[in-house]
Amino acid sequence: MRIDDLTQRLRALGAKPAHEQRVLRAWVQRSSMDNRRQAAKDFLPLALREALPALTAELEGLARLRSQHPGEDGSARLLVELADGQTVESVLLLRDGLCVSTQLGCAVGCVFCMTGREGLLRQLGSAEIVAQVVLARSLRPVKKVVFMGMGEPAHNLDNVLEAIDLLGTAGGIGHKNLVFSTVGDYRVFERLPRQRVKPALALSLHTTRADLRAQLLPRAPQIAPQELVELGERYARSTGYPIQYQWTLIEGVNDSPEEMDGIVRLLRGKYALMNLIPYNSVPELEFRRPGREAAVALAAYLHRHGVLAKLRQSAGQDVEGGCGQLRARVVKMDRRPRTARATPPTA
């Protein structure tokens, strides 16, 4: 379901813009449709009031909690079941943050990512994206949403921008606390500056070498790292939000002194933050995370050379922390043949 479809249905029930906003705000913020001045029964059209119970049940069914996996760091990884029975992952982050998925699967095919191994199964509608926030708000407050879960937001741009617009208006989330994460796509840099709600931007860089980037992200748009940084810098200066560059640290792949010097050349003097994220090793893939001391040394090197850098850990690292790992494990278990129960012998 898309937000636009939802608003069209509300209008067909006689809703004016003020009625739409009352209903949407109550849904996204999990609040009452009554306010201090006027009860919903005295404000909403009769046809809309009569349709609300069924509509509310339908919205609640867009995203249901299948399982919750608390992490030792205070985060929690959520396996979310959609209305068609498919599952995606969301992650409750520290300091009232939430990471949401935008696609079921992913077409980019990052070689180090579990989500990309399945390819793209389907897009999530904008209402399904927002429903992950609504579900999370039933568990904790959510004041920041990062679009960094399963999927590539740039490949589902209309739905993601529609979700961002609702979250940044009726959802009550500050624009800079909505973070659009992408491997880089020219359409993103064309459309984001024109939006009513302009999110912060996170760019997945992972290497300063164009040839290695093409190997690691085989189906991403072939934008050279230097051009990607230039596009990011333009957006950062126009919005006043620094670009967050994402760098998954993989031992022996992109953790060399040459790569760190490349980061310095690209980012020194830029309105930017480099997030170094040690890779979450999984048995199915050959990549490995560098040691803690080595990762700390890399972040310190960047600091000394004028690049603001943070060493981050994937939230919920101890509970299938890499993107798509939890879903992959559950899908694998669901596909496992079930053993019939033995019938006890009769006397």
Curated annotation (Swiss-Prot):
UniProt superkingdom: Bacteria
Enzyme class: transferase
Bridged cysteine pairs (disulfide): 99-323
Residue intervals of the Radical SAM core domain: 92-318
GO biological process: rRNA base methylation; tRNA methylation
Active site: 89, 323
E.C. number: 2.1.1.-
Signal peptide, first to last residue: none
GO CC field: cytoplasm
Entry annotated with the keyword Ribonucleoprotein: no
Protein residues bound to S-adenosyl-L-methionine: 151-152, 181, 204-206, 280
Cellular location(s): Cytoplasm
Binding site for [4Fe-4S] cluster: 106, 110, 113
UniProt keywords, alphabetically: 4Fe-4S, Cytoplasm, Disulfide bond, Iron, Iron-sulfur, Metal-binding, Methyltransferase, S-adenosyl-L-methionine, Transferase
Molecular-function GO terms, alphabetical: 4 iron, 4 sulfur cluster binding; metal ion binding; RNA methyltransferase activity
InterPro entries per UniProt: Aldolase_TIM (IPR013785), Methyltransferase_A (IPR040072), rRNA_lsu_MTrfase_RlmN/Cfr (IPR004383), rSAM (IPR007197)
Necessary cofactors: [4Fe-4S] cluster
CC cofactor note: Binds 1 [4Fe-4S] cluster. The cluster is coordinated with 3 cysteines and an exchangeable S-adenosyl-L-methionine.
Family: Belongs to the radical SAM superfamily. RlmN family.
UniProt-listed NCBIfam families: PRK14464.1
Protein name: Probable RNA methyltransferase azo0122
Organism encoding this protein: Azoarcus sp. (strain BH72)
